[in-house]
Amino acid sequence: MQIEDYEQVYALWLTISGFAIRSVDDSKEGVERFLQRNPGISVVAEEDGKIVGAILCGHDGRRGCLYHVCVDPAYRRRGIGKDMVVHCMNALHKEGINKVSLTAFTQNDVGNAFWKEIGWTKREDLNYYDFVLNKNNIIRFNR
């Protein structure tokens, strides 16, 4: 994926149910920052010049993560999603990454079935937490 793909990818994201977009992280600037930090790892799938699938993929030097995995519903069940995942996994492996995670909404039945189908393991032994950091709450972490 290149930043030039952003408009088509963003339009695709808007068509996917069970998907969440954040205005800051998923802005063009946010995605460009992510792609610069993780060059050559994210991927798009194209059919006749149209982007029909995308994965934002990156790592922190220790663990990999897949974000915003999506395939246009009209193009599903053709192996596009699996091919994109294989691309990302190979790219991460070349970077020395040996463990990869992702987050899927509990009620995203299509997505959850896909991950199980291609051999991913759903973790039952941990809780997932996040914290939306902004200028108003950063003071919690100042001494």
Q: Which residues does each PLM region occupy?
A:
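A short, internal acetyl-CoA/4′-phosphopantetheine-binding micro-motif in the GNAT/acyltransferase core
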Residues: E46, V69-R76, A104-F105
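A short beta-loop-alpha structural element at the N-terminal edge
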Residues: M1-A11
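A short helix-loop-beta-strand connector motif used in the catalytic cores of GNAT acetyltransferases and
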Residues: A20, E32-V44, C65
